[in-house]
Amino acid sequence: MGSQHSSALTFCQRKKDDNPEDLLADRDQEEAIAQFPYVEFTGRNSITCHTCQGAGYIPAEQVNELVALIPHSDQRLRPQRTKQYVLLSVLLCLLASGLVFFFLFPHSVLVDDNGIKVTKVTFNEQDSLVVLDVTATLKIRNSNFYPVAVTNLFSQVQYMKAVVGSYTTTNVSLIAPRSEHLVNFTVKAEVGGPSSYVYFYCTLPAIRVHNIVIFMRTSVKISYIGHISQSTLETQHYVDCGVNSTAAQSLFLVPRGPHL
């Protein structure tokens, strides 16, 4: 303990014996070093730092304008599970694309004949004509996951290869997704004439049932997602031209369609 105390006293005495001029010289040297500008040494010469302009600090207004340099070996530049995230993103994109393709891919729109429901018969004695108001029905089935529009319907009635009546209309109906819809329309047909036996046959009281065969060709245009298709049906029906009737019997059906 005695030796440590004596050495401490000796050190203090040496400090007191130091020359005050040496202490002033040391302070001047520290201040000179503190005022020395911040520079970058490239080996042969030095370049003043462009960021702080040698001041050793960054102005507050430039804090949001400067970019920090990160070493290439920094772990922040190597995110974990990158491959898993990329693979998951690719799978999700493929799944979404497949679902969009499945739901938006155009499916068939089926048009079927549902028969003749009502036949109204009137006679024109002056011109020897049998006037038939034929009400037919189409069954349209939409298999898509979006609505389709029936934009045009055209029907033509023939008897013995002669056109005796026609009907056309636009903006018929809008069919909901995955559903079917019945479309009714009435065609007026005039059969007979002065040189025809039809009027005599249909008005002959000795015959109980006055059946004639009419031929109908019906075309339907359907629009969906910028795509237009056309279906054509050709049917033949038995019609009693002597009296008004309902639910006329179909002879056979020849479907044609859809056509692009």
From Swiss-Prot:
Top-level division of the source organism's lineage: Eukaryota
Residues with a covalently attached lipid (N-myristoyl glycine): G2
Main location: endoplasmic reticulum
Keyword terms of this UniProt record: Endoplasmic reticulum, Glycoprotein, Lipoprotein, Membrane, Myristate, Transmembrane, Transmembrane helix
Bilayer topology: Multi-pass membrane protein; Lipid-anchor
Glycosylation site list: N184
Alphabetical list of InterPro entries matching this protein: TMEM106 (IPR009790), TMEM106_C (IPR048509), TMEM106_N (IPR048511)
Disulfide bonds, paired cysteine numbers: none
Keyword Cell wall biogenesis/degradation: no
Subcellular location field: Endoplasmic reticulum membrane; Membrane
GO cellular component: endoplasmic reticulum membrane
Transmembrane region(s): 85-105, 196-216
Family from the record: Belongs to the TMEM106 family.
Assembly and binders: Interacts with TMEM106B.
Protein name per Swiss-Prot or TrEMBL: Transmembrane protein 106C
Gene name in the database record: Tmem106c
